[in-house]
Regions:
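Outer-membrane beta-barrel translocator domains and adjoining extracellular loop/strand segments
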Residues: 17, 25-33, 75-87, 115-116, ...
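Glycine/serine-rich loop-strand microenvironments at binding/catalytic pocket rims
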Residues: 1-45, 104
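Residues on the lipid-exposed face of transmembrane beta-strands in outer-membrane beta-barrel proteins
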Residues: 2-6, 52-56, 100-104, 132-136, ...
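Transmembrane beta-barrel outer-membrane domains
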Residues: 8, 33, 43-47, 63, ...
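Intrinsically disordered, low-complexity acidic/polar segments
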Residues: 11-13, 24, 61-63, 79, ...
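Gram-negative outer-membrane beta-barrel transporters
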Residues: 17-21, 40-119, 173
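C-terminal beta-signal and adjacent terminal beta-strands/loops
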Residues: 121-123, 131-177
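Strand-connecting loop/turn motifs
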Residues: 6-11, 61-65, 107-109, 136-141, ...
Length: 177
């Protein structure tokens, strides 16, 4: 992996290129549908990709600090063939991902964050997720309302774990500092 990072006042930039070669990837496999699934080291994978992130802080009108972060990542997986007919978990890594976050402070007590993620996995599944958080700070307490997956998107993350649909949280934090 090799990368470049630039930080100056209210602007930041990160760029990284990487290459990873892995062998003996574990998957549950079988040669016919009558056989039980067996965990086996079955594959080799060569992965290359890059990540790019930009961030900018600024002030807008009567609002306090505003922050915009934008990121893009691209991953290319080269899978070597397996000798098994059936695989329980097809390797399904991220292929392309765009992220954007906008954080704004209304005043010294109120702030909000809007987060956007658009992703494409190697099985060509594409999805978009939007999250929102608003927080109110009073003395040592912070009360937040969090809305996750506002679009109620059905999608899976790492290891094909299905992620929850739309959900909301109320969070109360106390700082002992």
């Amino acid at each position: 992996e090799i990368g470049l990072k630039y930080l100056k006042d209210d602007f930041n930039f990160n760029f990284a290129l990487y290459q990873r070669d892995a062998s003996d990837i574990i998957d549950y496999v079988r040669n016919n549908e009558a056989q039980p699934w067996q965990a086996s080291n079955i594959r080799e994978i060569n992965t290359s990709g890059f990540e790019l992130n930009l961030g900018y802080k600024f002030y807008l009108g009567s609002f306090r600090r505003q922050t915009i972060n934008i990121g893009y990542s691209s991953i290319d997986d080269e899978l070597l063939e397996t000798d098994f007919a059936f695989s329980r978990y097809a390797l399904n890594s991220l292929k392309n991902q765009i992220t954007a976050t906008y954080m704004f402070e209304v005043n010294e007590n109120i702030s909000s964050t809007l987060a956007y993620k658009n992703a494409e996995r190697s099985d060509e599944e594409k999805y978009t997720v939007i999250d929102f958080r608003t927080s109110y700070k009073l003395d040592k307490f912070t009360l937040s309302i969090i809305l996750n997956n506002i679009l109620d998107t059905e999608y899976s993350e790492t290891n094909l774990v299905p992620m929850p649909g739309f959900n909301s949280l109320v969070e109360l934090n106390y700082s002992i500092n």
